[in-house]
Regions:
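Broad hydrophobic/π-residue packing in well-ordered secondary structure
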Residues: 16, 56, 112-114, 132, ...
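Cysteine-based protein phosphatase catalytic domain of the PTP/DSP
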Residues: 29-149, 171-182, 191-195, 233, ...
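Cysteine-dependent PTP/DSP-like catalytic domain, specifically the C-terminal lobe
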Residues: 137-140, 161-220
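Solvent-exposed, flexible loop/coil segments flanking beta-strands in beta-rich domains
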Residues: 206-230, 235-241
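Alpha-helical interaction elements in eukaryotic regulators
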Residues: 4, 14-17, 75-82, 126-129, ...
Length: 340
């Protein structure tokens, strides 16, 4: 009986070990599939036993998604794996730039070689923060020729691409925003997996890369003089597909330095004046309507790039630029701001 029981226990132990191995193997496969699903066709690092949402944009610039712990590491880069990778490949020579305003981690994971430049998701950095960022990178790179930077936001695409692109311009890899943006997109996109573009797509982010190129190439690293401007009017063109189509159900909120400085409810025209304009285009049956708002907004300081007019077409506006919204935002949809 004892011999049979011993044999049974050994068999049961072997069975349990096999099951644990199978479950562990299955978990790894599920994690791998989940990370692939979330990262889509972003170029991943799959060498030396690593599988990370991480791309060498240049030999000393890395873009990656957020280094996560806990349940988020199931579908994002596990922070311990990122540490293992960087300590193996670039020991003592890497610096992390965390662009997430919404999330952080213990900097001691990366030997406290971390600097934060918080940017809200789908938003842009200020020009001042752009200048601070490139100054910080220059200082780090000049300390040792082996030094590298690792830049991340949450997905390692929009905010990450914005800041890496301005660094590529600052370090003379490229002269224009267009060249820099195209290059980052090509490096971050794994075309063998899918043709979906994984570069900077948000219009405002691309526009701010252009602003940075302007500061470097035209203003020779000096921000243009800050000027106090008053918003004279805001005009929204071709509004017939938005809400009621006459602008009366719109609400306009202006935010500066993450603070709401002005709100206008178009239904009551509180804090502003407005009118709806309909115009029949010559040689066309299309009615083009627009809403014109006259603001009593107090003056605020901004960095001024002439002229005193900002006109943004549908393709230059965040969200209306997406094809899936074009049943709402028609082809001639645009926003115009006049200043004085």
């Amino acid at each position: 009986f004892i011999v049979r029981l011993t044999f049974l226990l050994k068999y049961l132990r072997l069975f349990m070990l096999i099951k644990i191995f199978q479950l562990s193997n299955s978990k790894k496969k599920i994690e791998k599939a989940a990370r692939k699903l979330v990262s889509e066709n972003k170029r991943r690092y799959r060498k030396d036993g690593f599988d990370l949402d991480l791309t060498y944009v240049t030999n000393n610039v890395i873009a990656m998604s957020f280094p996560s712990s806990g349940s988020r590491s199931f579908y994002r880069n596990p922070i311990r794996e990122v540490v293992k990778f960087l300590d193996l490949k670039h020991p003592g020579h890497y610096k992390i730039y965390n662009l997430c305003s919404e999330r952080s981690y213990n900097h001691s994971y990366f030997h406290n070689s971390v600097e934060r430049f918080p940017i809200d998701d789908h938003n842009v950095p200020t020009l001042i923060d752009m200048m601070r960022f490139v100054d910080s990178v220059f200082e780090w790179m000049e300390k040792d020729p082996n030094n590298i930077i690792v830049v991340h936001c949450m997905g390692g695409k929009g905010r990450t691409g914005t800041m890496i692109c301005i660094w590529l311009i600052a370090s003379d890899h490229f002269k224009t925003a267009k060249e820099s943006l195209e290059y980052f997109g090509k490096r971050r996109t794994d075309t063998a997996s899918s043709s979906k573009f994984q570069g900077v797509e948000t219009p405002s982010q691309s526009r701010y890369v252009e602003y940075f190129a302007l500061v470097k190439n035209k203003y020779h690293w000096a921000l243009p003089q800050s000027q106090t401007l008053r918003i004279k009017s805001i005009t929204i063109y071709s509004i017939q597909g938005v809400g009621k189509g006459n602008g009366k159900d719109l609400k306009i909120v202006l935010i500066m330095k993450k603070k709401i400085i002005y709100t206008c409810f178009c239904s009551s025209l509180k804090s502003c004046q407005g009118r709806s304009v309909k115009r029949l285009e010559e040689g066309s049956q299309q009615i083009v309507n627009k809403v014109l708002l006259f603001s009593r907004l107090r003056k605020h300081q901004i960095y001024y790039f002439p002229p005193l007019r900002l006109y943004l077409h549908r393709n230059e506006l965040d969200n209306p630029h997406k094809q899936k919204t074009w049943n709402i935002y028609h082809e001639d949809f645009a926003v115009e701001l006049l200043f004085n």
